[in-house]
Structure formats: structure tokens, C-alpha cells
Amino acid sequence: MPSERQKYIRNFCIIAHIDHGKSTLADRLLEKTGVLTSREMQEQVLDNMELERERGITIKAQAVRMVYKASDGHEYIYNLIDTPGHVDFNYEVSRSLAACEGAILVVDAAQGIEAQTLANVYLALEHNLEIMPVINKIDLPSAQPEVVKKEIEDVIGLDASQAPMISAKNGLNIEEVLEKIVDMIPCPEADEKAPLRALIFDSFYDSYKGVIVYIRVKEGTLKTGDTIRLMYTKKEFLVTELGYLKPGGLSPADELKAGDVGYIAASIKNVRDTRVGDTITLVENPAKEPLPGYKKVNSMVFCGIYPADGSKYGDLRDALDRLQLNDAALTFEPESSVALGFGFRCGFLGLLHMEIIQERLEREYNFDLVTTAPSVIYRVTTTDGDVIEIDNPTNLPPVTEIDSMEEPMVKATIMVPTEYVGNIMDLSQERRGIYKDMSYIDEGRAMLTYEMPLNEIIYDFFDALKSRTKGYASFDYELVGYKESDLVKLDIMLNGEIVDALSFIVHREKSVARGRRMAEKLKESIPRQMFEIPIQACIGGKIIARETVKAFRKDVLSKCYGGDISRKRKLLEKQKEGKKRMRQVGSVEVPQEAFMSVLKLD
């Protein structure tokens, strides 16, 4: 049974596809409950990063506490936990959902259900959350709320007959949403006297207090001055401050009880000690079992990041260290490349995560960066029977020592208007996708399921998908495991020397076409020198493509007016000798544009 205090608490999150109005609805709820005055309002209050506002996406989970006086006369405490919507941050989403009892599902009245709406709904159902649908953007001329209601019922199986119809932008019917939360979202039920178990769903670094951890107390009570233990990392800390969350700040309190959402500060120095999903308990009266669902987040996509100016190496390390304070999913280790000098091999959750980190380095820390082609983790079985994981093509053992190679596979869900289904099938086959399933959501839209290699998605699959469907397709993927594949390492040689930063791993069927395109692209972007430069693509020792950047030539015959042919020949031979010598000692400068052009091959 919930205690008297718990009856008036509602913990919920808002889930939606990108651009369906999740952050705008959160803004309106804050305004209506008086947490913020309209003067303090700025768009997307919970998206703290400038980048989040600009791209219109939520990257870090946030939480806020509101007090709402309902029509039944009671005051309710609403804890809204804002979740990232993008597939890269899937684990963060699942932990945020685990901190709630219910979820508001926001669906755009003009667009209907999209791929990530579905992915997040399934996650919410796995956590047994009560889902409350809300139909947004009903003020748009193209809105079809009744059609969307039917879609919610058919595709997800939720009863949408009572769903509030709102316009978050204009603040229409927001009151109805606040009232519905009381009825539809269950209150927490937990024992305040049991041993403490609290779930970490986010953490960030504060330069004065150290790491501040966002928690949801599942059982028990936590007070200032308690000594806590993190059940997975086994670290112990003394709680110096705890309290509730409000936009743009913290409001300290004396204790947090079962059902509460709040924060704690405990002089923690490193974000890596407070892993998202870990369980906090008390040292004096520890819980027997941690909360279920914790897993260590592993990087999926890797790339080399190098400063364009080699002397900035130390600064780049500092910047990455700072970013890592708030982003435990970012990993990096030093690496050096013959072509690019010293830099770092960085690991990310996915493509969006990689782009965001690169953009933040360039924008917040003013770096000029050179990045290598993104790569995934391959599993290589050697002829001795050892299994090694490779995230950098330059570390691949010689062909003679490899018995087999496996690559990570994903299950891709693509939602698309029916007239583009053919285009998507072509694209998926080009990317070595294996067709699994297809179903129709309504007359105009289909849902396709494919199994694909992650390697084929990380380059520019998303761009290709959008361009072939005029921007209408939406896409979501999840990892399904590893699969053996015929993969080879493609090397690029300039002037007879391998450029390590341009090597990558590719499927054998595609290797020749890829090698040719790379050679052509490089020929366009490498400036001419005084000697000719052969550009060769090779697999093992076999050359599969070649292009030549022609040399500049001085006209050595300009002084010869007529005269003997052998005199001219002597001068030309002499020039040829000089070019040959130059070629032996000359090194080729590869401009940054050349690296970038090779990444954008298709």
C-alpha cells in the first residue's frame, strides 16, 4: 500500500519522436504549475546545452519537480524526468524510464507514429509503465487527430479515446494534461523503512560540489550525513548535500524518502564512479540485491580525432577530459598515426553521439580537428584460435593469421510512406541488409524490418534514407549480435607508402568499387606536386585500383630553337631523372579535405 505521502507523488517522463514537441510540452507544464514565470521562460528549458537547443534534440536526461493543485483540492508533486529521444542514448532512456511509474506519449497530429516513438513505447512497456497518450500540434492545418488516435490504437494497442488534444506551442488544453496525470499515472508504492535502494539515472559534474548524482529512491530513506555505497562500483561516499531538482538549480532538503526523485552531492571526484543504472544503498544497513537492469555501456562506433595543429595535443586531452566529466559513455585513448601525428582513438555510443562530441570540441573549445573514418568493433578469430576485438583497422593482424572475422549486426526498423518502399528496399540491399518483415501501419505508411551490418549504417545511411524518401522516412536500430562475414582491409598507398589514417575494413564484394572510388576522390583532392604521385588501393599485396596525380612540368625546351633532336632528348632525359629522384625523397602532404572527401564517398 502506498503511504499517505506517496499518494500525492507522480513520477513520469515524456516520450516522443524527435520534433513531436516533447520539450515544448515540458516547458508548458513548468509554466502552468508556476515553477517558472513567463518572464523566465525560454524555449526548451530542460535542454541546457546550446547544441541541444540548436538541433532541437535532448542529449542529457534532466529532471524537475513541480507542485500542482488539482481540481480535487489536493496538492500533488510531479517529478518530470526528461529523456533523450535518440537511439544512441537508448540506455540512458531505459534508466530514466526505470525511475518513473508512467510515461506521457506525445504524438504529432500531422505526422503520426514514427520509428522512435515505437522504440521508446516498447521500452516503456518493458518497464511496466502506464502510458498516457497525448496528441500535440492540433493547431496545424495538416493535423488529423482522429486518424492519429486510430493509429495509436492499431499500432501500439493503447486506448486513445480519452487522449488530450493539445497544442504545446500555444498552450492549448495543457490543464487537461495536468489533470489526467493524477488519474492515469500511478503513485509510487514502496516501503520507507526498508534498507535503502536508489537508482542513479544521471550525473553531472559541478566544479564546486564535485559530481552531482540524480537519483530515484525506490525503497528506504536517505539523509544528509549518511554514508552510501554504490553496489556495482563498490565505492563509498559521505552524503554532504541532498535535495530536489528545479530548473536551472537545486533546492536542498534534509531527506529523500521512497518514491522521491532528487539529487545527492557527496564529494565524488569522477563521473565514472557513478554509473547510470547503479544502485545506491547505505553502508550501515545495506540492501541484499541491487536494482535490476544495470549494464555497462559499451562504445559502438570508434574514430581517430587529431588536432590539425600538432602542438594542441595537450589541449585536446584536457578538452576530452572535461567532456568526459559529464559523459561517461565517451571513451578515449592516445594513438599516433604516421600521417596525422598524435591524437586520440575515441569511442562513442553511435553516430549522433560522435557528431555531437566533435561539434562540441570545435565549438566550445575552438579546435580545428582532423577525424578518420568511423569504424565498429570487429571480432577476429586468429589461426591459433584466439579471439581478438579490433576497433582500429591498423591493428588488424596480417591476412595469413586470420581464420575468420565477425561484424556487429543491427535490427533496423524503417517507417516510410508506401510510395517509397521500393527505394528503401533497394537501399537496404545495397547496404547488405537481410529482409525480415514488412507490415502496413495504415493505408499510406509501411514498417520495414531489416537485419544489417552496423558498418553499413555508420557512414551515411541516414542521409541516403532521407534523400530517397524526400525526408519522410524515420529509422531506428538496435544491436542483435555478431555474424561471420567476408571482410578485408583496404589500404591506400600514396607514392608507394601506406597512409594508415585512410585504411578501413570493408566487405570483399564492395572492396574493388570502394577502392576505385577512393582513388578517384583522392586524385581530385590532392594538389599536384613537382613529381607525379601514384594513388593505389590495395588489399593485402594486391593492387585493385590506381590513379595518378600528374606532375607540374617546366618547359626545358624553351631555349632550343630548332637544332639537333638529340640535344632536346638529353634535356628531357635529365628532367626525367630529376623527377625520379624527387619522387624517391618527396613526401606527399594530404590535406584535411582529402580525408573528408573519402568519408563522403557515396
UniProtKB/Swiss-Prot annotation:
| Residues reported in the UniProt entry to bind GTP | D19, H20, G21, K22, S23, T24, N136, K137, I138, D139
Give membrane topology per the record. Peripheral membrane protein
Give the GO terms filed under biological process for this record. Answer: positive regulation of translation
Q: Which UniProt keywords apply?
A: Cell membrane, GTP-binding, Hydrolase, Membrane, Nucleotide-binding, Protein biosynthesis
Q: Which InterPro entries match?
A: EF-4, EFG_III/V, EFG_V-like, EFTu-like_2, G_TR_CS, LepA_C_sf, LepA_CTD, LepA_IV
Is-annotated flag, keyword Nucleotide-binding? yes
Gene Ontology CC annotation, any one: plasma membrane
Q: Report the protein name in the record.
A: Elongation factor 4
Q: Which organism is it from?
A: Ruminiclostridium cellulolyticum (strain ATCC 35319 / DSM 5812 / JCM 6584 / H10) (Clostridium cellulolyticum)
Report the gene name.
Answer: lepA
